[in-house]
Amino acid sequence: RGLGDVYKRQDTNGVYADVMEKALYNGIISGISLDGTKFFYVNPLAVKPKAVKKDQRLIHVEPRRQKWFACACCPPNLARMMTSLGEYIYTTEGNTVYQNLFIGSDMKTEVNGKEITLHVTTSYPWEETVSVRVESMEDAAFEYAFRVPGWCRGMTVTVSYTHLRAHET
């Protein structure tokens, strides 16, 4: 079981998944360059190059991402995190599939002895629309629980062109 399972067991209202999302977008993926060749080895959250040079407390902070070096621990940890991302995106318990993070992905699982596949399409966090398509060879009754982010103030759910009210837990 992944960290997402631990968090979901503690609280199903999405608070822990909000923290996972913030860490993912603001700490983890921001630490690597788009081409995957340079890294921030510390995450100062904000870098002002002139201030870094003048302030002795920031001597360990590099104002630009650095290339790989001999004793690198961050790049392998980033790779490990990204390859285990599925454990954070989805969790299951009983007949409920939880979607903790909104990331374009496919998830195949078994619920009540029936195989289902969720196809999630999104450009989140840059766009707020998330599309979920459920695929199953046979009728499969299950609950699909998705997180309403703590910052979200106006959400709509549409199933087969019908607007629905979501249940909050």
Predicted regions and their residues:
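Short, solvent-exposed turn/loop segments enriched in Gly/Ser/Thr/Pro and often Arg
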Residues: R1, S33-F40
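Well-ordered alpha-helical segments within folded domains of soluble proteins
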Residues: R1-K8, P75-S84, E128-V130
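Conserved small/polar residues in nucleotide/adenosyl-binding loops
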Residues: G2-Q10, T162-T169
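Catalytic-core region of carbohydrate-active enzymes that cleave or remodel glycosidic bonds
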Residues: D5-D35
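Generic alpha-helical structural context detector
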Residues: E21, Y25-I29, F40, R80-T83, ...
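Short, surface-exposed recognition loops and adjoining beta-strand edges that mediate ligand/DNA contacts
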Residues: A23, T37-K50
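Catalytic cores of secreted or luminal carbohydrate-active enzymes
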Residues: P44-H119, Y124-P125
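Beta-rich accessory regions
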Residues: T91-R165
